Amino acid sequence: MTTEHFEELNDQQIIRREKMAALAEQGIDPFGKRFERTANSGQLKEKYADKSKEELHDLADTATIAGRLMTKRGKGKVGFAHIQDREGQIQIYVRKDEVGEENYEIFKKADLGDFLGVEGEVMRTDMGELSIKATHITHLSKALRPLPEKFHGLTDVETIYRKRYLDLISNRESFNRFVTRSKIISEIRRYLDGQGFLEVETPVLHNEAGGAAARPFITHHNAQNIDMVLRIATELHLKRLIVGGMERVYEIGRIFRNEGMDATHNPEFTSIEVYQAYADFQDIMDLTEGIIQHAAISVCGDGPINYQGTEIKINEPFKRVHMVDAIKEITGVDFWQDMSFEEATALAKEKNVPLEKHFTEVGHVINAFFEEFVEETLTQPTFIYGHPVAVSPLAKKNPEDPRFTDRFELFIMTKEYANAFTELNDPIDQLSRFEAQAKAKELGDDEATGIDYDYVEALEYGMPPTGGLGIGIDRLVMLLTDVTTIRDVLLFPTMK
C-alpha cells in the first residue's frame, strides 16, 4: 500500500484508524484471534423457529455467535444490532447493565463492517424477532473502510464484478447463488460417484491444443524452453485414461479459450467431461439427462423450472431429434439426399445461410443450416444428434450412414449445454481427421486443432468402445439460478 493511498483517506477512514489505535491502546488486538462459536444464525433460527417469547424465556438457552456488524441503532445504555454470518443475519440486544461498561463501549464504538463475537441468551423481542441478549461482546476484527452506502445491494454492476467480496457482503441473493453453484457441483459429483465413476485430474498445460474447436492461450515454459498452451478441453487426456483401463472417469475443472466474451462466454470457465468404456452416445444421452435432472432436483425441486419467465420441463424425458430431421422440419431442405458440395452451397445461397471460406464439405453446410435456423427454436430440453463428420473430428461415424456421427448436443433455451458422442477409437481414422483439421487451420480456421501424434499412438494400443460427454457447468448454473449473464455465476469473472 502506497503513501499516496494514505494521503487519500477520507474522514470515515481516518476515524476508523483512530478507533483501531484506541483498541490497541486498551490491549485489544484490532484484528482479533481465534473465536469459538456454538451456533450460527441459521442453526438458531431453525432450532427455535416455533418457540414463543415466553418459551424462550423459560428455556434460558445461551449461544455464542460471530459475524459482521451490518446494522446498529439505539442510544444511551441500550442498543440493537444485526450480525451477519454465512447463513444470514440475526439481531443482538445489548444492555450496558448486562455486559458491563467496558464491554458496552466496545459495542458502542464498533463500526458497521466490524466483526464481533457475541455471547448471550436466546430470546424473542416484543416484535417477534429472534435475538441474542448479549452478556459479553468480543471485538474480532476492525473494518478500516465503510461498507457501500446501500448495503442491501450494490447497484454498480462494474463494482459487483470487480469487488465480488462487497457484493457477497451486501447482496444475499448473490451470496446464495454461489452457494447454489457449489451445491450443484457437489451433487453432480455425488451422482457420478454413485454410478461408479472415478474423479481424476489431468494437466492444464498442454503441448498441443486439442479436444475442442477453440483458440488457445499460449504461454512459454522457461526451463524447457518450449511454448505450451492452456487446455481448451480435458478430452484427450481423459481418453488416454480409458486406454489405460480406468473405464469410467470424469474431471471437473477450468478450461481456457482465447475468444470473445458475451453473456454466455468467459475466457476461463468450468466444465465437466465424463468418459465411459463400453458405452455409446445413446447411453451417454441417458447419463446426461440423469446428471442434469439430479442437479435440478437438488436445488429447484422435482418439478419444472422457470427460466426468465419460461417454464422449462426439465423433469420430463428430453426430446431426441436427428440434426437433418430438425433442419428439414423447419426449412424443408432435405440433407438426407446425396448431394455435392456445390449443390449444398447453392442451397445455402438460396436460403441466405452464411458460409466460411474454410468450408469444404457438405457437412459444414448442414451444420451452418442448423445454426442459422434450428438453434433458436430449441427452448425445451432437446438432444440434437447425428452431426456431420466434418464438424465432429473426435466422434465415431454412424455405422448406418457414415456421413454423420454418433454425436449429440443438448440444447435448452436455444443454448448448448452438453456435447457428447461415441468416441472415435480407430487410430487410422483419427489421424486422418486430425490431418483434415490441420488443413482447415491452414485455410484460416483459427479454431481448428493440430495433430496430436501422442494421442494417436495411445489409440494404437487399443481403446474400448467409449461414450464421452462435456457439460458447461457455468451455463447449467445460470439455468438453475435464473440469471442471464455468466458473470453472475462466476465469483471473479474476467474484466478489462
UniProtKB/Swiss-Prot annotation:
GO MF annotation: an example: transferase activity
UniProt-listed PANTHER family: LYSINE--TRNA LIGASE, CHLOROPLASTIC_MITOCHONDRIAL, LYSYL-TRNA SYNTHETASE
Subunit structure of this chain's protein: Homodimer.
Cofactor(s) the protein needs: Mg(2+)
CDD domains: LysRS_core (cd00775), LysRS_N (cd04322)
Main location per the UniProt record: cytoplasm
Class in the EC hierarchy, top level: ligase
PROSITE patterns: AA_TRNA_LIGASE_II
Reactions mediated catalytically: tRNA(Lys) + L-lysine + ATP = L-lysyl-tRNA(Lys) + AMP + diphosphate
Protein name in UniProt: Lysine--tRNA ligase
Species of provenance: Streptococcus gordonii (strain Challis / ATCC 35105 / BCRC 15272 / CH1 / DL1 / V288)
Keyword Ligase part of the UniProt annotation: yes
Keyword Protein biosynthesis: yes
Textual note on the cofactor: Binds 3 Mg(2+) ions per subunit.
E.C. numbers: 6.1.1.6
Coiled-coil intervals, chain numbering: none
Binding, Mg(2+) 1: 409, 416
Family under the similarity heading: Belongs to the class-II aminoacyl-tRNA synthetase family.
